[in-house]
């Protein structure tokens, strides 16, 4: 799991 990409996706959603 790419946590950096996951975190970026979360930030984009918020």
Curated annotation (Swiss-Prot):
Give the record's GO biological process terms: chemotaxis; killing of cells of another organism; venom-mediated mast cell degranulation in another organism
Q: Name one GO molecular function term.
A: G protein-coupled receptor activity
Q: What does the UniProt entry say about where the protein is found?
A: Secreted; Target cell membrane
Give the chief site where it resides: secreted
> Where are residues bearing Leucine amide located in the sequence?
14
Q: Sorted alphabetically, which keywords does the UniProt record give?
A: Amidation, Chemotaxis, Cytolysis, G-protein coupled receptor, G-protein coupled receptor impairing toxin, Mast cell degranulation, Membrane, Receptor, Secreted, Target cell membrane, Target membrane, Toxin, Transducer
Q: Which GO terms describe its cellular component?
A: extracellular region; membrane; other organism cell membrane
Which InterPro entries does this UniProt record tie to the protein? Mastoparan_peptide
- Tissue specificity as recorded in UniProt: Expressed by the venom gland.
**Family the UniProt entry places it in:** Belongs to the MCD family. Mastoparan subfamily.
Q: Briefly state the protein's biological role.
A: Antimicrobial peptide. Is active against both Gram-negative and -positive bacteria (Escherichia coli (MIC=38 uM), Pseudomonas aeruginosa (MIC=310 uM), Staphylococcus aureus (MIC=19 uM), and Bacillus cereus (MIC=38 uM)). Also causes moderate mast cell degranulation (ED(50)=100 uM) and low hemolysis (MIC=50 uM), and exhibits chemotactic activity for polymorphonucleated leukocytes (PMNL).
Q: What is this protein called?
A: Polybia-mastoparan-III
Question: Which source organism does the UniProt entry give?
Answer: Polybia paulista (Neotropical social wasp)
């Amino acid at each position: 799991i790419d946590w950096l990409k996951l975190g970026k996706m979360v930030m984009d959603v918020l």
